[in-house]
Amino acid sequence: MNFNQINKVMNALNLGEVIGEPVEVKGGLLHKMFRVCTLSGSYAVKVLNSEIMKRPTALKNTINSEKIAALFANSIPVVAALTVDGKQIHEKDGCYYMVFNWIDGKSIFAPDIYEMHCANIGDILGKMHSLNIIVNGVVPEEAETSLYEWEKYLQLAKGQGITDKTWMEQYEKSLNDIIEWNKQVCEAQEVLVQNQVISHRDLDPKNVMWNNDDPFLIDWEAAGYVNPYQELLEVINYWADDGKGNLDKSYFDAIVKAYGKHMNLA
């Protein structure tokens, strides 16, 4: 990605002539992000990974995720891609781009997470779930009910000639439990898919930007249908972690109390 390419994108979207060199923002795992200043303002430009975008459903999924973000932006603090000519995903010279208004802020992680942050996240999550939005083209998930060949894996491991067999012995000892747990997961999935809402689905600390005490939800690529209480448990594990692998009860309570203002927990 060079200056000329970004300048072409910004001009094509009528966002102004670029001032100075774009600055790469580190931290993205799959895509590249740049801070770009133009005569009209400051923007974050996401350059989508070209290899990922070759996948058959990648463009459709990305478009749907931004439709979800845009709809939620009416009710919760969301950083959604700018819509230009009715599109949030823009193609230029074979590459795909998303452009966002720049927001000053940073993600926070344990041990810098406090009750206030947890209460904010619980409140936002509860609001999202209570809205129960519908987006054309986004369909509920089917249950993932794969029973894995755990016994086959054990026999394959035994045939590898592994010298350190400590883990293999533990695997064999736990084999019946593992098979039973797998069955229970499949049964639980059949129940969970009966109650689904559209949500963010990846609300861990790296996907929330904080400007002072104000949160903004970013990176909506994973957005879609999920069981609300399954996501609540995932969010609790993300945000109530004390940084040492344990859950802080006061943080747990803050999330649940705020969430319960919008969703029934009885």
Regions found by a protein language model. Give the residues of each.
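Conserved short submotifs of the Hanks-type protein kinase catalytic core
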Residues: 93-106
